[in-house]
Amino acid sequence: MTDKRKDSSGKLLYCSFCGKSQHEVKKLIAGPSVYICDECVDLCVDIIREEIKELAPHHERSELPTPHEIRKHLDDYVIGQELAKKVLAVAVYNHYKRLRNGDKADGVELGKSNILLIGPTGSGKTLLAETLARYLDVPFTMADATTLTEAGYVGEDVENIIQKLLQKCDYDVQKAQRGIVYIDEIDKITRKSENPSITRDVSGEGVQQALLKLVEGTVASVPPQGGRKHPQQEFLQVDTSKILFICGGAFAGLDKVVAQRLNTHSGIGFGAEVKSQNEKASEGELLAQVEPEDLIKFGLIPEFIGRLPVVATLGELNEDALIQILQEPKNALTKQYQALFKLEGVDLEFRKDALTAIAKKAMSRKTGARGLRSIVEAALLDTMYDLPSFENAEKVVIDENVINGKSEPLIIYSQPENQASGE
């Protein structure tokens, strides 16, 4: 085929499909007695791509992993948080079992098991959600609750969350409807006051109201891929009742709300049991006893709490847990940096006192596991900068002093060949 603007007689040419003249299009491709323009070619490609997508089988695990198998996989990547992993494994298993059986079992309608994760920063909330989605091979997206506002106000509309999920699976609606959505910082959209206000709270209670239907289950209308380019296309209809929503937040101060309730319910007077300072419950122990009434007092509206029936609490990670996180998971931080150095042909060794120093530093910063990478990165920055220029470097050793900025990493060099042979 050839690209032609005019035939041999100089006659004006037209596209045989859309009828546009050669002056209205960029290219006109000639075939045996027919012509097709570049716009029609693009349209044909889009049609074929859509048909291939519809005919392609939806990849889904043939067998749903059991709660034990889900928990075991989480153990490979997440240290500690045993109760939270158990709760998540059961909730996720029940959710996908419900989807496979068409929302009903023996005529009984099965409700959604959306999840609320409560735990301090860096305790593993996001990692748990990401690991679950990766293991189950389902689309996953994250949203920050602090950026959301009610429709019509400056900020991100809640239905943008579904748009992000669709983007992750190339706008395959069926695949998106089996996905997992993690909404972080959910504690930041609490009501500003327990008393109703005459002023509109568009980023607090207003967002909770907007999320209600989405989390419970509704048919969301989402603009198709390239919606602005093709405004005539119909909106995609996504059933959110099949999407698993996991909401997470630190809920700073919630432990005090729980403690207040427990103290109120405990006896007072001569017969009351008096607890010493040492017997007082820790923050983690208090959060493990959280009730819906505590969350309402904290600022979540009752209707929203009702849409998150499964509640899992995560404890603050101690020093030993942080040391484990540094070296035990399959994608442990020390293993990642060792693999990075190995690409340069150099071994990297972290001594035990270095791991302890990293954990202590993260504890003092109160950043949990999230702060570990920045500490290691800062300690290795100069070495990683110089390493590609080093000759005969064989090993880099990191100890406590390196982490605390008191000394440089120890670099061990291999002996040059001419020295080794005695020349």
From Swiss-Prot:
CDD domains membership: RecA-like_ClpX
Highest taxon listed in the record's lineage: Bacteria
Cellular component GO terms held in the UniProt record: HslUV protease complex
Matching InterPro entries: AAA+_ATPase, ATP-dep_Clp_protease_ClpX, ATPase_AAA_core, Clp_ATPase_C, Clp_protease_ATP-bd_su_ClpX, ClpX_bact, P-loop_NTPase, Znf_CppX_C4
Pfam families noted in UniProt: AAA_2 (PF07724), ClpB_D2-small (PF10431), zf-C4_ClpX (PF06689)
Sequence positions that bind Zn(2+): 15, 18, 37, 40
Molecular functions (GO terms): ATP binding; ATP hydrolysis activity; ATP-dependent protein folding chaperone; protein dimerization activity; unfolded protein binding; zinc ion binding
Domain called ClpX-type ZB: residue spans: 2-56
UniProt entry keywords in alphabetical sequence: ATP-binding, Chaperone, Metal-binding, Nucleotide-binding, Zinc
A GO biological process held by the record: cell division
Binding site for ATP: 120-127
Keyword Zinc: yes
Subunit-structure text: Component of the ClpX-ClpP complex. Forms a hexameric ring that, in the presence of ATP, binds to fourteen ClpP subunits assembled into a disk-like structure with a central cavity, resembling the structure of eukaryotic proteasomes.
Function recorded in the entry: ATP-dependent specificity component of the Clp protease. It directs the protease to specific substrates. Can perform chaperone functions in the absence of ClpP.
Family, per entry: Belongs to the ClpX chaperone family.
Protein name, UniProt field: ATP-dependent Clp protease ATP-binding subunit ClpX
Species whose genome carries this gene: Proteus mirabilis (strain HI4320)
Species lineage: Bacteria, Pseudomonadati, Pseudomonadota, Gammaproteobacteria, Enterobacterales
